[in-house]
């Protein structure tokens, strides 16, 4: 099974080797017939502490690194 890759924005970099990434998705609401935005925050492993708040990055699924971290930073995505 291929690993999922998501794109998002770094909203926190306070933890060592960890960034919090906000991923936003859009979908059509079945009853209201309008586009709805929904966001979720993921903790991702940043080995070199190189990403700062506001950076656009891509994260990829991985094996569990800690209690909450199951994603790793793959690359800096330019939007």
From Swiss-Prot:
It comes from the Bacteria. Disulfide bonds: none annotated. Keywords: Ribonucleoprotein, Ribosomal protein, RNA-binding, rRNA-binding. Transmembrane segments: none annotated. Part of the 30S ribosomal subunit. Belongs to the universal ribosomal protein uS17 family. This is Small ribosomal subunit protein uS17. It comes from Bartonella quintana (strain Toulouse). The lineage of its organism: Bacteria, Pseudomonadati, Pseudomonadota, Alphaproteobacteria, Hyphomicrobiales. The gene is rpsQ.
